[in-house]
Amino acid sequence: MGKTWEWDGLVDQAAQELRQLYFRERIQVSRKTVWREVPHLIQVSRRSAVDKQWFRGLGLKRQFVVRGAAASRDARKAVLLGEFAAAQWGMWFVAPKDHDVQFALPSGHLPPKNALPVSTKFKAFKTPPADTAELDGVRVTHPLRTYVDFCRMQKVVNARLAIGWLLRHGFTADEISDYADSFAGSIHPRRRRLAAILPYQVPHLETFPYMLAHSLLDDSRVNVRTHCELDRMGFATLLAGNDLVILIDEDPHWRALEAEPDGLRLAHNRRKRERWEAARGFRKLYFTAAEIEGAPNSFVSEVI
């Protein structure tokens, strides 16, 4: 991609459609709104509300898209940061415990506390035009800058996930590292080194659940390898230690496969391979993506 980054092709269609739907459906509110008279609405920013049932059915990450877009329209110059910027792009991330919308001003100055919009936090990070983009009028840091900000904020798991997403979208480890190394903003030397080195330590995994599992285990110093051949017959996307295969959203009996055309024999062979691997000492742990994302510490402790 060179030095001139093209961001339009990276916009996630689902996030874009949700953002545009919010702008069509939003209802303007004010301090004078009498909420008991509109019990079907929920406030998503100082000046905006949406249908309560619809919003609560979105799930936390999609709520981040709506809340970030709403808060951005209320804040005239502010730029979304961190997980709230990642949500607008459809990047891979895990939601933080603090759900306040994260912002920065282009100057890097912090606004007076009495001027802060509700449920927002500002970082003293400069956000020059070269580090930002607009998605349907919502000001966000671009994906490379979002990755560096995760490193600045010591959110290493989300930094790893951002790398995985960038690799999947055609960036190289060299491009990510070079951007971090030449980043002009203020950043602690150790975190700059981390941002420059980390792209070479993150494997290329095609899906968010496996990338999340690898990031959590690697961050916990668990010896985990990817794309491993098991004694010439089996295969593991993730192998912890020497014998523990991590499987996510997989059916151990391959029942769904049997319903497909010509799937009966293939399902039989998959089950036979499972038994072959078990007979040679390979253990398997099955998780769903929702289990890992909902209880990451529990996932790591079960593997350890």
List each model region and its residues:
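Surface segments flanking catalytic/ligand-binding clefts of nucleic-acid enzymes
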Residues: 9-13, 20-26, 167-304
